Amino acid sequence: IDLIGSVTAEVIERSRVPVLAIPENTPFKQFSEAKRIAFITNFDQRDLIAFDSLINNLKSFKFSVSLIHLSDVQNTWNEIKLAGIKEYFQKQYPQLEIYYDVVKNDNLLSSLDSYIKSNHIDIMTLTSYKRNIFSRLFNPGIARKMIFHSDTPLLVIYGRPN
C-alpha cells in the first residue's frame, strides 16, 4: 500500500487537473453516489476558484457541501470568514445546500475522521497550491495517513495561480 500511496501522492502533486484518489477498499463507484462533499479551505483566493470549479464540474449531480477550515484554536474570525464564503456561494448557487464548520486541528487525523463519520461525508476535497500539495495544509505524514488509511475518497483540485 505504501508504493501505491507514493505513486498516488506523486500524481496528485504533479497534476494540473483534478485528481480523485479512491482508497482501495472503498465501495465508491460514481459521483452520483456522493451526497455530502467536504471542501477544506485555508481562506486562499485559489480555494474559492477551486470551489467554483468543483461546483461547475459536478452541477449535474445532487449533493450538499460542507466548507471546512482546520484550526489549532477556536477563533471567531474563522467562523466569520466561513460564513461569508458560504453566503457568497449561496448567492452563486442557490440550489446548493452549503454548510460550514471549523474543525479543531489538535489531532488532525482523528478530528477529520470524526467529522467525516458524524457528518456522513462521501468525498473530501482540497486545493493544491504548488508542486508540494500538502506543505501548506498538512503535515505530510498525516496527509498520507488521511489519504491511504481512510475509506473516504479525496478529490484534489489544482489551484491556479492568481
Q: Where do the protein language model's features map onto the residues?
A:
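Redox- and metal-dependent alpha/beta enzyme cores, enriched for Fe-S-associated oxidoreductases
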Residues: 45-93
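Short acidic active-site motifs
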Residues: 7, 81, 107-113, 142
